[in-house]
From Swiss-Prot:
It is a multi-pass membrane protein. The gene is Slc66a2. Residues 14-80, 149-215 form the PQ-loop domain. Keywords: Membrane, Phosphoprotein, Repeat, Transmembrane, Transmembrane helix. Pfam families: PQ-loop. Its main location: membrane. It comes from Rattus norvegicus (Rat). This is Solute carrier family 66 member 2. GO terms for biological process: phospholipid translocation; retrograde transport, endosome to Golgi. The chain crosses the membrane at residues 7-27, 49-69, 72-92, 143-163, 168-188, 232-252. InterPro entries: PQ-loop_rpt, SLC66/Scramblase_ANY1. PANTHER family: PQ-LOOP REPEAT-CONTAINING PROTEIN 1-LIKE PROTEIN, SOLUTE CARRIER FAMILY 66 MEMBER 2. The keyword Transport does not apply.
Protein backbone atom coordinates (compact mmCIF):
# COMPACT_ATOMS: atom_id res chain seq x y z
CA UNK A 1 0.00 0.00 0.00
CA UNK A 2 2.80 2.39 0.90
CA UNK A 3 4.60 1.65 -2.37
CA UNK A 4 1.40 2.27 -4.31
CA UNK A 5 0.91 5.52 -2.42
CA UNK A 6 4.35 6.74 -3.45
CA UNK A 7 3.78 5.81 -7.07
CA UNK A 8 2.17 9.13 -7.89
CA UNK A 9 5.32 10.87 -6.62
CA UNK A 10 7.93 8.63 -8.26
CA UNK A 11 6.53 8.98 -11.78
CA UNK A 12 6.79 12.79 -12.01
CA UNK A 13 10.12 12.67 -10.14
CA UNK A 14 11.50 10.26 -12.74
CA UNK A 15 10.18 12.55 -15.47
CA UNK A 16 11.87 15.55 -13.85
CA UNK A 17 15.20 13.71 -13.62
CA UNK A 18 14.91 12.77 -17.30
CA UNK A 19 14.31 16.40 -18.27
CA UNK A 20 17.25 17.60 -16.17
CA UNK A 21 19.53 14.95 -17.69
CA UNK A 22 18.40 15.90 -21.20
CA UNK A 23 19.00 19.59 -20.46
CA UNK A 24 22.47 18.81 -19.11
CA UNK A 25 23.21 16.81 -22.25
CA UNK A 26 22.09 19.66 -24.52
CA UNK A 27 23.81 22.56 -22.76
CA UNK A 28 26.59 20.85 -20.78
CA UNK A 29 28.93 20.75 -23.76
CA UNK A 30 29.06 24.54 -24.11
CA UNK A 31 29.78 25.25 -20.42
CA UNK A 32 33.59 24.88 -20.77
CA UNK A 33 33.64 27.74 -23.29
CA UNK A 34 31.89 30.25 -21.03
CA UNK A 35 35.03 31.13 -18.99
CA UNK A 36 37.11 31.35 -22.19
CA UNK A 37 34.53 33.63 -23.82
CA UNK A 38 34.45 35.87 -20.74
CA UNK A 39 38.26 35.99 -20.56
CA UNK A 40 38.51 37.08 -24.20
CA UNK A 41 35.88 39.79 -23.71
CA UNK A 42 37.53 41.00 -20.52
CA UNK A 43 41.11 41.09 -21.82
CA UNK A 44 40.28 41.86 -25.47
CA UNK A 45 42.94 39.31 -26.38
CA UNK A 46 42.15 36.06 -28.22
CA UNK A 47 45.73 34.89 -28.83
CA UNK A 48 45.47 32.16 -26.20
CA UNK A 49 42.49 30.44 -27.83
CA UNK A 50 42.87 28.36 -30.98
CA UNK A 51 40.02 29.03 -33.40
CA UNK A 52 40.78 25.64 -34.93
CA UNK A 53 38.97 24.23 -31.88
CA UNK A 54 35.87 25.89 -33.33
CA UNK A 55 36.63 24.35 -36.73
CA UNK A 56 36.90 20.86 -35.25
CA UNK A 57 33.63 21.16 -33.33
CA UNK A 58 31.77 22.70 -36.26
CA UNK A 59 32.80 19.85 -38.56
CA UNK A 60 32.09 17.17 -35.93
CA UNK A 61 28.62 18.46 -35.09
CA UNK A 62 27.61 19.10 -38.70
CA UNK A 63 28.58 15.49 -39.49
CA UNK A 64 26.66 14.27 -36.44
CA UNK A 65 23.51 16.08 -37.58
CA UNK A 66 23.87 14.55 -41.05
CA UNK A 67 24.38 11.15 -39.40
CA UNK A 68 21.04 11.63 -37.63
CA UNK A 69 19.24 11.64 -40.99
CA UNK A 70 20.64 8.19 -41.73
CA UNK A 71 20.33 6.73 -38.25
CA UNK A 72 18.15 8.48 -35.71
CA UNK A 73 19.56 8.84 -32.21
CA UNK A 74 18.31 10.56 -29.06
CA UNK A 75 16.90 14.06 -29.58
CA UNK A 76 19.04 15.64 -26.81
CA UNK A 77 22.19 14.65 -28.74
CA UNK A 78 20.77 16.28 -31.87
CA UNK A 79 19.94 19.48 -30.01
CA UNK A 80 23.37 19.37 -28.38
CA UNK A 81 24.95 19.55 -31.84
CA UNK A 82 22.77 22.51 -32.85
CA UNK A 83 23.58 24.41 -29.65
CA UNK A 84 27.30 23.65 -30.04
CA UNK A 85 27.34 24.96 -33.62
CA UNK A 86 25.74 28.23 -32.52
CA UNK A 87 28.20 28.51 -29.63
CA UNK A 88 31.23 27.98 -31.88
CA UNK A 89 29.96 30.64 -34.28
CA UNK A 90 29.68 33.06 -31.35
CA UNK A 91 33.25 32.21 -30.30
CA UNK A 92 34.49 32.79 -33.86
CA UNK A 93 32.66 36.11 -34.06
CA UNK A 94 34.21 37.35 -30.83
CA UNK A 95 37.73 36.14 -31.69
CA UNK A 96 37.57 37.71 -35.15
CA UNK A 97 36.37 41.07 -33.82
CA UNK A 98 39.03 41.14 -31.09
CA UNK A 99 41.91 40.14 -33.35
CA UNK A 100 41.00 42.56 -36.12
CA UNK A 101 40.71 45.37 -33.58
CA UNK A 102 44.15 44.50 -32.20
CA UNK A 103 45.91 44.23 -35.54
CA UNK A 104 46.13 47.71 -37.05
CA UNK A 105 48.10 46.80 -40.16
CA UNK A 106 46.84 43.26 -40.74
CA UNK A 107 46.56 41.93 -44.28
CA UNK A 108 42.96 40.89 -44.62
CA UNK A 109 42.29 37.25 -45.48
CA UNK A 110 39.05 36.35 -47.20
CA UNK A 111 37.22 33.09 -47.88
CA UNK A 112 35.25 34.54 -50.78
CA UNK A 113 36.63 37.00 -53.31
CA UNK A 114 34.67 40.26 -53.21
CA UNK A 115 35.19 43.65 -54.77
CA UNK A 116 35.77 46.46 -52.29
CA UNK A 117 37.27 49.83 -53.18
CA UNK A 118 38.06 50.48 -49.53
CA UNK A 119 40.32 47.43 -49.38
CA UNK A 120 42.16 47.83 -52.69
CA UNK A 121 44.89 49.92 -51.10
CA UNK A 122 45.27 47.59 -48.13
CA UNK A 123 45.41 44.11 -49.61
CA UNK A 124 47.25 42.21 -52.35
CA UNK A 125 45.28 40.64 -55.24
CA UNK A 126 42.36 38.55 -54.03
CA UNK A 127 42.74 34.81 -53.58
CA UNK A 128 40.35 32.25 -55.11
CA UNK A 129 36.97 31.63 -53.50
CA UNK A 130 38.18 28.45 -51.86
CA UNK A 131 41.63 29.22 -50.49
CA UNK A 132 42.87 26.10 -48.71
CA UNK A 133 46.44 27.34 -48.41
CA UNK A 134 47.34 26.20 -44.86
CA UNK A 135 48.91 29.61 -44.21
CA UNK A 136 45.65 31.44 -44.90
CA UNK A 137 42.80 28.98 -44.42
CA UNK A 138 40.75 29.74 -41.28
CA UNK A 139 42.74 32.94 -40.69
CA UNK A 140 40.28 35.38 -42.18
CA UNK A 141 39.54 38.89 -40.96
CA UNK A 142 35.77 38.79 -41.43
CA UNK A 143 33.26 36.66 -39.56
CA UNK A 144 31.19 36.44 -42.76
CA UNK A 145 33.99 34.43 -44.38
CA UNK A 146 33.78 31.80 -41.65
CA UNK A 147 30.01 31.59 -42.08
CA UNK A 148 30.40 31.15 -45.85
CA UNK A 149 32.93 28.38 -45.29
CA UNK A 150 30.63 26.57 -42.85
CA UNK A 151 27.67 26.89 -45.23
CA UNK A 152 29.76 25.62 -48.15
CA UNK A 153 30.93 22.58 -46.17
CA UNK A 154 27.39 21.88 -44.95
CA UNK A 155 26.01 22.10 -48.48
CA UNK A 156 28.61 19.75 -49.99
CA UNK A 157 28.45 17.24 -47.12
CA UNK A 158 24.66 17.41 -47.10
CA UNK A 159 24.43 16.73 -50.83
CA UNK A 160 26.79 13.74 -50.58
CA UNK A 161 24.75 12.41 -47.65
CA UNK A 162 21.53 12.84 -49.63
CA UNK A 163 22.96 10.78 -52.49
CA UNK A 164 24.34 8.04 -50.20
CA UNK A 165 21.72 7.94 -47.44
CA UNK A 166 20.62 4.41 -48.41
CA UNK A 167 24.11 2.98 -47.94
CA UNK A 168 24.52 1.52 -44.46
CA UNK A 169 28.31 1.57 -44.86
CA UNK A 170 28.28 5.29 -45.70
CA UNK A 171 26.00 6.13 -42.77
CA UNK A 172 28.14 4.20 -40.27
CA UNK A 173 31.31 5.75 -41.68
CA UNK A 174 29.73 9.20 -41.35
CA UNK A 175 28.96 8.52 -37.70
CA UNK A 176 32.50 7.28 -37.08
CA UNK A 177 33.99 10.39 -38.72
CA UNK A 178 31.78 12.61 -36.54
CA UNK A 179 32.99 10.89 -33.35
CA UNK A 180 36.62 10.76 -34.49
CA UNK A 181 36.61 14.46 -35.44
CA UNK A 182 35.26 15.36 -32.01
CA UNK A 183 38.01 13.23 -30.45
CA UNK A 184 40.52 15.56 -32.14
CA UNK A 185 39.01 18.55 -30.30
CA UNK A 186 42.01 19.39 -28.14
CA UNK A 187 44.68 18.79 -30.79
CA UNK A 188 44.62 22.37 -32.21
CA UNK A 189 45.03 23.80 -28.70
CA UNK A 190 47.78 21.26 -27.96
CA UNK A 191 49.67 22.24 -31.12
CA UNK A 192 49.15 25.96 -30.53
CA UNK A 193 50.61 25.64 -27.01
CA UNK A 194 53.57 23.63 -28.34
CA UNK A 195 54.27 26.12 -31.16
CA UNK A 196 54.21 29.13 -28.83
CA UNK A 197 55.82 27.28 -25.90
CA UNK A 198 53.18 28.88 -23.72
CA UNK A 199 49.59 28.46 -22.51
CA UNK A 200 49.15 32.17 -21.83
CA UNK A 201 45.60 33.27 -22.64
CA UNK A 202 44.22 29.73 -22.52
CA UNK A 203 41.48 29.20 -19.95
CA UNK A 204 42.61 26.47 -17.55
CA UNK A 205 39.01 26.16 -16.36
CA UNK A 206 37.99 25.29 -19.90
CA UNK A 207 40.55 22.47 -20.13
CA UNK A 208 39.62 21.13 -16.68
CA UNK A 209 35.98 21.03 -17.77
CA UNK A 210 37.03 19.27 -20.98
CA UNK A 211 38.89 16.66 -18.93
CA UNK A 212 36.12 16.02 -16.42
CA UNK A 213 33.45 15.85 -19.13
CA UNK A 214 35.47 13.56 -21.39
CA UNK A 215 36.38 11.29 -18.46
CA UNK A 216 32.72 10.94 -17.45
CA UNK A 217 31.66 10.34 -21.06
CA UNK A 218 34.35 7.69 -21.63
CA UNK A 219 33.47 5.89 -18.40
CA UNK A 220 29.83 5.87 -19.52
CA UNK A 221 30.82 4.33 -22.87
CA UNK A 222 32.93 1.62 -21.21
CA UNK A 223 30.40 0.71 -18.52
CA UNK A 224 27.47 0.58 -20.92
CA UNK A 225 29.19 -1.44 -23.64
CA UNK A 226 29.07 1.29 -26.29
CA UNK A 227 30.53 0.52 -29.74
CA UNK A 228 34.32 0.19 -29.71
CA UNK A 229 34.96 3.35 -31.73
CA UNK A 230 33.13 5.45 -29.11
CA UNK A 231 35.31 4.10 -26.29
CA UNK A 232 38.56 4.44 -28.27
CA UNK A 233 37.76 8.02 -29.31
CA UNK A 234 36.76 8.88 -25.74
CA UNK A 235 40.05 7.57 -24.37
CA UNK A 236 41.93 9.55 -27.02
CA UNK A 237 40.12 12.73 -25.94
CA UNK A 238 41.09 12.17 -22.31
CA UNK A 239 44.74 11.62 -23.29
CA UNK A 240 44.81 14.89 -25.26
CA UNK A 241 43.19 16.76 -22.36
CA UNK A 242 45.80 15.41 -19.95
CA UNK A 243 48.57 16.39 -22.37
CA UNK A 244 47.27 19.98 -22.44
CA UNK A 245 47.18 20.06 -18.64
CA UNK A 246 50.76 18.75 -18.68
CA UNK A 247 51.73 21.63 -20.98
CA UNK A 248 50.13 24.13 -18.61
CA UNK A 249 52.19 22.73 -15.73
CA UNK A 250 55.44 22.47 -17.70
CA UNK A 251 55.29 25.93 -19.27
CA UNK A 252 54.29 27.53 -15.97
CA UNK A 253 57.29 26.05 -14.14
CA UNK A 254 59.77 26.22 -17.02
CA UNK A 255 58.83 29.25 -19.12
CA UNK A 256 60.79 29.71 -22.32
CA UNK A 257 61.14 33.13 -23.88
CA UNK A 258 60.86 33.00 -27.67
CA UNK A 259 63.79 34.30 -29.69
CA UNK A 260 63.23 37.82 -31.04
CA UNK A 261 62.16 37.90 -34.66
CA UNK A 262 60.32 40.08 -37.11
CA UNK A 263 56.58 39.68 -36.92
CA UNK A 264 54.85 38.90 -40.18
CA UNK A 265 51.13 39.65 -40.41
CA UNK A 266 50.33 36.07 -41.39
CA UNK A 267 52.44 34.47 -38.66
CA UNK A 268 51.23 36.85 -35.97
CA UNK A 269 47.87 35.13 -35.85
CA UNK A 270 47.29 32.35 -33.35
CA UNK A 271 45.87 29.11 -34.59
Amino acid sequence: MEAEGLGWLLVPLHQLVSWVAAGAMVFGGVVPYIPQYRDIRRTQNADGFSTHVCLVLLVANILRILFWFGRHFESPLLWQSIVMILTMLLMLKLCTEVRVANELNVKRRSFAATDSKDEELRVPPRRPYLDFDPHHFWHWSSFADYVQCVLAFTGVAGYITYLSIDSALFVETLGFLAVLTEAMLGVPQLYRNYRHRSTEGMSLKMVLMWTSGDTFKTAYFLLNGAPLQFSVCGLLQVMVDLAILGQAYAFAHHPQKPAPHAVHPASAKAL
